[in-house]
C-alpha cells in the first residue's frame, strides 16, 4: 500500500493505477476540478501526502499546475507520452502497470528554496537544447530522473525545483549516453 494519496484525472485512470498498486486515490474530473476537490486534496496532503499523476499532455500539465498552485508540497509522478499512448488516445489509463509503478517510485517533491544548480549552459553542453536529438534526450532524461518531459526552460525549472543533484543528473546522462551507443 502506498502511503500517499494518488491524484489522477478520471475514473479510467483510477482503474489503471489500481492494476499497478494498492493506494487511496482522488479523481479530479479533468478540467471540472473545483474547490471541493481541492479541499479534499489539501486534507489528504496534510494527512498522508499526495502524489499527482496526470496525463502526459497539455491538459494534464494544466491540471497539475492548477493543483500545485493551490496545494503546497505535493509530489509529482510522470509517465512518458509513449507510455501513455494507445492508438491515438493519450492518458494514464493507457499506461502499463510497470510504467505507473516506475513513475510512482520516481515521484519528486518540489523544494521550497529557489535553486540555481542548473541553467541553459547545462542544457547546451549536454545536448538537451539546440540539437537535433535534444527533444528525445530531454524526454528520456526526464523519465530517468522522474520529472517528465517538457521544453528546455521548464526542464531547467524542474531540475532545480525538484532538487535533482548534479551527481544524479550526470549519472542519468551517462546512462542515457550508454544506452545510445
Curated annotation (Swiss-Prot):
Reaction catalyzed: Endonucleolytic cleavage of RNA, removing 21 and 42 nucleotides, respectively, from the 5'- and 3'-termini of a 5S-rRNA precursor
Keywords tagged on the record: Cytoplasm, Endonuclease, Hydrolase, Magnesium, Metal-binding, Nuclease, Ribosome biogenesis, RNA-binding, rRNA processing, rRNA-binding
Cofactor(s) needed for function: Mg(2+)
Binding site for Mg(2+) 2: 55, 57
Enzyme class: hydrolase
E.C. designation(s): 3.1.26.8
Residue span(s) of domain Toprim: 3-86
Keyword Hydrolase in record: yes
Cofactor binding remark: Binds two Mg(2+) per subunit.
Chief localization: cytoplasm
GO biological process: rRNA processing
SMART domains linked to this entry: TOPRIM
Positions that bind Mg(2+) 1: 9, 55
Domain of life: Bacteria
Coiled-coil ranges (or none): none
Pfam families (UniProt xref): DUF4093 (PF13331), Toprim (PF01751)
Record's subcellular location: Cytoplasm
GO cellular component: cytoplasm
Classification via PROSITE patterns: TOPRIM
Role: Required for correct processing of both the 5' and 3' ends of 5S rRNA precursor. Cleaves both sides of a double-stranded region yielding mature 5S rRNA in one step.
NCBIfam families: 5S_RNA_mat_M5
UniProt family annotation: Belongs to the ribonuclease M5 family.
UniProt protein name: Ribonuclease M5
Source species of the chain: Clostridium botulinum (strain Hall / ATCC 3502 / NCTC 13319 / Type A)
Gene: rnmV
Amino acid at each position: 500500500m502506498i502511503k500517499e494519496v494518488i491524484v489522477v484525472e478520471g475514473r479510467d485512470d483510477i482503474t489503471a493505477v489500481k492494476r499497478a498498486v494498492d493506494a487511496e486515490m482522488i479523481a479530479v474530473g479533468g478540467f471540472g476540478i473545483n474547490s471541493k476537490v481541492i479541499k479534499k486534496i489539501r486534507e489528504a496532503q496534510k494527512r498522508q501526502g499526495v502524489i499527482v499523476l496526470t496525463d502526459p499532455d497539455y491538459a494534464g500539465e494544466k491540471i497539475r499546475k492548477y493543483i500545485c498552485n493551490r496545494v503546497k508540497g505535493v509530489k509529482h509522478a510522470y509517465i512518458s507520452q509513449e507510455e501513455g499512448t494507445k492508438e491515438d488516445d493519450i492518458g494514464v489509463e493507457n499506461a502499463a502497470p510497470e510504467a505507473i509503478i516506475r513513475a510512482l517510485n520516481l515521484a519528486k517533491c518540489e523544494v521550497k528554496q529557489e535553486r540555481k544548480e542548473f541553467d541553459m549552459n547545462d542544457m547546451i553542453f549536454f545536448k538537451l537544447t539546440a540539437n537535433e536529438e535534444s527533444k528525445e534526450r530531454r524526454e528520456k532524461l526526464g523519465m530517468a530522473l522522474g520529472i517528465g518531459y517538457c521544453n528546455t526552460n521548464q526542464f531547467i525549472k524542474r531540475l532545480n525545483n525538484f532538487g535533482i543533484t548534479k551527481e544524479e543528473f550526470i549519472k542519468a546522462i551517462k546512462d542515457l549516453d550508454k544506452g545510445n551507443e
